Curated annotation (Swiss-Prot):
Single GO BP term: maturation of SSU-rRNA
Localization (cell): Cytoplasm
Gene name of the encoded protein: rbfA
Matching NCBIfam families: rbfA
Gene Ontology CC terms: cytosol
Protein name: Ribosome-binding factor A
Family: Belongs to the RbfA family.
Keyword terms: Cytoplasm, Ribosome biogenesis
The species this protein was found in: Escherichia coli O127:H6 (strain E2348/69 / EPEC)
General function of this protein: One of several proteins that assist in the late maturation steps of the functional core of the 30S ribosomal subunit. Associates with free 30S ribosomal subunits (but not with 30S subunits that are part of 70S ribosomes or polysomes). Required for efficient processing of 16S rRNA. May interact with the 5'-terminal helix region of 16S rRNA.
Cited HAMAP family: RbfA
Length: 133
């Protein structure tokens, strides 16, 4: 039976905290002027690769999001070196940054559900308006 919370998950969780601190305190790139949040980290089983999922505070502008991801990719070597100092790992994983749109999609879905519920309540209050011919 497989472990439910193995070493890759524990390392990913700790790495998420450390990368968030590094982005907050060490990275001074003007392309990352917007607040960056690390929403998740997925580790490979051999701990050699990490997918880092980030969100940005002002993520309405698609060009700014692309520039932010590009800036993070370019700074990945620096972030990796700081991770090596902060965490005791034999191999510091290669970092790949991705934009996490799950928060935006979740808010969109929530708004859709809210509008459907509101429309349904309006139909219950005024049933004559919704009858057709």
């Amino acid at each position: 039976m497989a472990k439910e919370f193995g070493r890759p998950q524990r390392v990913a969780q700790e790495m998420q905290k450390e990368i968030a601190l590094i982005l907050q305190r060490e990275i001074k790139d003007p392309r990352l002027g917007m607040m960056t949040t690390v929403s998740g980290v997925e580790m490979s089983r051999d701990l050699a690769y990490a997918k880092v999922y980030v969100t940005f505070l002002n993520d309405k502008d698609e060009d700014a999001v692309k520039a932010g991801i590009k800036a993070l990719q370019e700074a990945s070597g620096f972030i990796r070196s700081l991770l090596g100092k902060a965490m005791r790992l034999r191999i510091v994983p290669e970092l790949t940054f991705f934009y996490d749109n799950s928060l935006v999609e979740g808010m969109r879905m929530s708004n859709l559900v809210t509008s459907v519920v509101k429309h349904d309540e309006e139909r219950r209050v005024n049933p004559d308006d919704s009858k057709e011919g």
